[in-house]
């Protein structure tokens, strides 16, 4: 579980956003007063960060990957100004700090050895045994035997808290349902007139911020299996259940995770754990319980890396871990659900 604990994913929007073509319409909703922000004090609200290519970024991107101190340490990154982020920009004086966490250097199962070890010969940009070293964003460059972050400089080399050289793959399941009144009717927002969508949110133990459940893809594991496993562990506390309870949870989740779904995003993640040589990538997938019956038969219970779990109304007032709010906005748009009281903002999207 250590690898999963260290690898909880955050994400922003890049050119590799993958959106399904389906737009789900809703009707028959009842209006209620506008909901208040359920998370007034946690997280931060990010703008969309769009990668402009494998060797350069726009001015408003690649921000979290340059923040100091590095998570879980007192290590300060070398400062990288916006105009020097891209690798195509010559910077002879660039002198990044070297840092790899002790927990990674200890050689757990989820971590690679050091590049300098003679017995370690990773096959970058391809499937390396059970380890996926291909990037969702295409080929990445190798410099002096080390992968180079496709989004640009971060001010730090090594792996930090990340186990793999190059891409570290994660998955984020976004489970949604319509908000309903006591009679079972869908509820609309009084200003936008659109039905209110809800999603399952967890409160992370490591930073106390609310987020989408999710975690690292285990070696050899399919993304679909990771999505279901992580939701069960964090939102249903499946790790602490009896064998019979686990089977029951598995059967109910199978019904939800087997239906049609929307791939909201996949690709590079602007994450504070990223370095010049190791970075996060994720696939965020929306599973929607249209009638609400499947999730009504499952009791939410925080587990694993989650301190709390609950259903949350979706709107632009949400402040979530990293840029999870961007994923949630995309879900609201694809489901034609309420997002903002500002109609113009709704129509412009990202």
UniProtKB/Swiss-Prot annotation:
SUPFAM superfamilies: Nudix. It is an enzyme of class 3 (hydrolase). Residues 124-135 have a biased composition (Basic and acidic residues). Residues 53-77, 116-153 are annotated as: Disordered. GO terms for molecular function: ADP-ribose diphosphatase activity. Its EC number is 3.6.1.13. This is ADP-ribose pyrophosphatase, mitochondrial. It comes from Rattus norvegicus.
